[in-house]
Every structure is written in structure tokens, then in C-alpha cells.
Curated annotation (Swiss-Prot):
Compartment(s) of residence: Lysosome membrane; Early endosome membrane
Protein name as catalogued: Transmembrane protein 9B
Signal peptide annotation: 1-33
Protein origin, superkingdom: Eukaryota
Membrane topology: Single-pass membrane protein
GO cellular component: early endosome membrane; lysosomal membrane
PANTHER family membership: TRANSMEMBRANE PROTEIN 9 FAMILY MEMBER, TRANSMEMBRANE PROTEIN 9B
Modified residues (Phosphoserine): S142, S189
Function: Enhances production of pro-inflammatory cytokines induced by TNF, IL1B, and TLR ligands. Has a role in TNF activation of both the NF-kappaB and MAPK pathways.
Length: 198
């Protein structure tokens, strides 16, 4: 049992370290992306015009200067076509908070790591809990094999005890046991007593 807990702790620390490493890599990529685009920018989307292809221009300027003449550099057209070209461009002033984005991603990855750790914990510990809490399964099977008129008398006591436990695993086990009892009762009524299912 001690080696199992030691293994779980090592697995948990390994998962935490991998989640932390993933967070650091993601933050590094976000900081690289932040170098390309600041938190405040003006973005102009210009469609194709004559022989010039469409293009997207980004520039870190104030909101009052967010127009085609200040953002589009170098200007792809000359002379009188500049005004016609700029009328086609759609410029938007954008603000974002990269700190909020980073914090949100860290929280998301932390929750994901905790859920993964919890899943591994349940996967490894569930068989031990089943053996300890529901070791009475052989008793129910032996009563059923004998053909007693009340084969589930002990099962009702066990189910009543499991009902008092408040964790999710016991509630699921209780629902499974209750369903199995109903199925067995229906089988008994159909095959032994030849009664149609209700």
C-alpha cells in the first residue's frame, strides 16, 4: 500500500511538472506572438486594387491616427489612386490584454492538470476501494446459487450502508447494485414464475 501511495505521489509530481512545462512553453509562444502584435494596434485590411493584391497592415499607433494614411506603409499606389485605395481599406483599432490571456491559459491548464491527476488517482485506487468496500459480492453470489427464497437479504443491508457514504463513487456503486438487483428480480420472475415484465 505504501508503494502505491509513493507511486501516486511520483505520478502526481510528474504530471504537475509536465503541466508546468507546458504552461511555460505556451507562455513563451504567447510572448513571441506579442512581439509581432502589441496589446494596442490599428489593423487595416485592404482588398485587391488594380494590379496590387490584398494585404493586412498592422501598426502600433493611437486611436485617433487609426486610418489608412497612417497605417499603410509603404503605400502600394501613387498619386490620385491613394485616396481610392484608402477608401477600400477597412481600419479597426484593437485592444487586448495579453496578461489576462496568459492568466486564463494558466488557470485552464492548472484545472486540466488537476482533473488529469484526479482521473489517474481514481483509476489506480478504485480497484482497492472496490475490494475493501464491496467484498460482499461473493456472499450475494453464494446466496443466489443456493436458490434461497430471499437471496438479496444481505444485499439490502450492504446497500443501506453504502447509501450512508456521501462520495460519488459510492453513489455510483449503489446505483449499479440497485440496477443489478432489479434485473435479477425480473429474471427470476420471468424464468421461474413465468410472469411477463411489467
Amino acid at each position: 500500500m505504501a508503494t502505491l501511495w509513493g507511486g501516486l505521489l511520483r505520478l502526481g509530481s510528474l504530471l504537475s511538472l509536465s503541466c508546468l512545462a507546458l504552461s511555460v512553453l505556451l507562455l513563451a509562444q504567447l510572448s513571441d506572438a506579442a512581439k509581432n502584435f502589441e496589446d494596442v494596434r490599428c489593423k487595416c485590411i485592404c482588398p485587391p486594387y488594380k494590379e496590387n493584391s490584398g494585404h493586412i497592415y498592422n501598426k502600433n499607433i493611437s486611436q485617433k491616427d487609426c486610418d489608412c494614411l497612417h497605417v499603410v506603409e509603404p503605400m502600394p499606389v501613387r498619386g490620385p489612386d491613394v485616396e481610392a485605395y484608402c477608401l477600400r481599406c477597412e481600419c479597426k483599432y484593437e485592444e487586448r490584454s495579453s496578461v489576462t490571456i496568459k492568466v486564463t491559459i494558466i488557470i485552464y491548464l492548472s484545472i486540466l492538470g488537476l482533473l488529469l491527476l484526479y482521473m489517474v488517482y481514481l483509476t489506480l485506487v478504485e480497484p482497492i476501494l472496490k475490494r475493501r468496500l464491496f467484498g460482499h459480492a461473493q456472499l450475494i453470489q453464494s446466496d443466489d446459487d443456493i436458490g434461497d427464497h430471499q437471496p438479496f437479504a444481505n444485499a439490502h443491508d450492504v446497500l443501506a450502508r453504502s447509501r450512508s457514504r456521501a462520495n460519488v463513487l459510492n453513489k455510483v456503486e449503489y446505483a449499479q447494485q440497485r440496477w443489478k438487483l432489479q434485473v435479477q428480480e425480473q429474471r427470476k420472475s420471468v424464468f421461474d414464475r413465468h410472469v411477463v415484465l411489467s
